[in-house]
């Protein structure tokens, strides 16, 4: 494996600590009403008030793709990043934030550029300046913002983040460092229910806006056979999250760390990293196993060949689409269902957005090439 990380590294500009909220967001942000990643059952009137969808409805619906922030590593949703105090979490957060803001590969992983907000709630601006200038030099990037104070989850954090998203609709990643700083004071009253509730609230927000919330947290002192059992608190934190990263060292003074990764939208991984003490960045040393990739899908391959930068769009009926797909011999209704359930892969692997809607004249399919480099 090779290290694709580029070496030209600008620094970061500093944003204000707080943003004003508004009753209505008027930007092009797609909210929960039409871009909720989680399954939204259609409301039905019945005696029991349970909203359901049939398997037929499930297959006939196109759900928006879950966008990668870092391919095979980090996606939209809510993730935990957990490690012991002073293990190097904040250096990793700064490194990740910079790479996403600049769109530079993180080691061998492709990164999708976007605005980043880093809530460095255990730091001050002077410390951030020293750390970041040592890591990235003094050239600036306008896509990376910092705040050292924020409200708690129950006291208006969501309004603050909404205000930032309103001003920066291309935001892709928000880092909260640390979870404890945005929790209500609970002491020993924390429970599975309260742990699950706070992450669920954060996840609801990230799903509503299609962004990634990466929440930094600490491990507990007690060792465990399963590294994910070392997350401080109860299993409610991991149970509600979309995934988690656990950073561990054998000894605090070691330069080498293991990064265990688990998630709903990416394969489980164990990476070996080495800390460069001169530049204060984490370097990739290797992975325990190579990532398993789905084999090519002949249908998606045929669809991808239809579009090009010169002809980035196509729309028509499913029957017309079948006529364009040489070598594909299935019924039109089966074609649309296969594309419905493959919309996520079609977007993330081929850069093609797939839409399907029914009009008074029948069903219409639209294909749009949004990223020819996918």
Segments predicted by a language model, with ranges:
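Post-Walker A helix-loop "phosphate-sensing" segment adjacent to the P-loop in P-loop NTPases
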Residues: 99-113, 347
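DNA transaction DNA-binding modules
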Residues: 272-374
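Phosphate-binding/switch region of NTP-binding enzymes
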Residues: 80-82, 86, 90-91, 119, ...
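Hydrophobic positions on the alpha1 helix immediately C-terminal to the Walker A/P-loop
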Residues: 92, 96
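Core recognition of P-loop NTPase motor domains used across DNA-transaction enzymes
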Residues: 2-75, 87, 130, 138-141, ...
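Pre-Walker A (Motif I) flank of P-loop NTPase domains
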Residues: 75-79, 114
């Amino acid at each position: 494996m090779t290290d694709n990380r580029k070496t030209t590294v600008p620094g970061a500009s500093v944003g204000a600590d707080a943003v004003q909220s508004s009753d209505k967001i008027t930007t092009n942000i797609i909210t929960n009403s039409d871009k909720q990643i989680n399954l939204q059952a259609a409301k039905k009137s019945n005696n029991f008030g349970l909203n359901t969808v049939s398997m037929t409805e499930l297959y006939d619906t196109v759900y928006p793709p879950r966008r990668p922030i870092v391919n095979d590593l980090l996606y939209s949703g809510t993730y935990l990043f957990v490690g012991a105090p002073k293990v190097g979490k904040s250096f990793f957060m700064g490194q990740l934030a910079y790479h996403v803001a600049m769109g530079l590969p993180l080691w061998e992983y492709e990164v999708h550029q976007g605005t980043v907000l880093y809530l460095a709630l255990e730091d001050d601006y002077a410390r951030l300046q020293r750390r970041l200038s040592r890591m990235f030099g003094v050239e600036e990037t306008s896509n990376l913002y910092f705040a050292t104070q924020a409200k708690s989850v129950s006291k208006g954090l969501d309004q603050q983040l909404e205000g930032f998203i309103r001003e920066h609709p291309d935001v892709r990643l928000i880092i909260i460092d640390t979870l404890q700083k945005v929790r209500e004071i609970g002491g020993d009253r924390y429970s599975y229910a309260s742990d699950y509730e706070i992450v669920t609230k954060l996840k609801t927000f990230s799903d509503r806006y299609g962004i990634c919330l990466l929440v930094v947290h600490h491990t507990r002192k007690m060792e465990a056979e399963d590294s994910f059992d070392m997350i401080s608190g109860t299993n409610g934190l991991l149970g509600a999250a979309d995934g988690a990263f656990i950073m561990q060292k054998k000894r605090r003074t070691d330069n080498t760390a293991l990064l265990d990764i688990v998630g709903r939208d990416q394969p489980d991984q164990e990476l070996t990293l080495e800390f460069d003490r001169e530049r204060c960045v984490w370097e990739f040393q290797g992975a325990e196993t190579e990532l398993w990739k789905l084999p090519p899908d002949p249908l998606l391959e045929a669809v991808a060949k239809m579009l090009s930068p010169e002809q980035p769009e196509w729309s028509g009926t499913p029957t017309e689409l079948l006529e364009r797909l040489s070598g594909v011999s299935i019924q039109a209704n089966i074609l649309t269902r296969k594309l419905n359930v493959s919309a996520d892969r079609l977007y993330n692997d081929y850069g093609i957005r797939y839409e399907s809607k029914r009009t008074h004249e029948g069903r219409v399919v639209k294909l749009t090439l949004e990223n020819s480099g996918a």
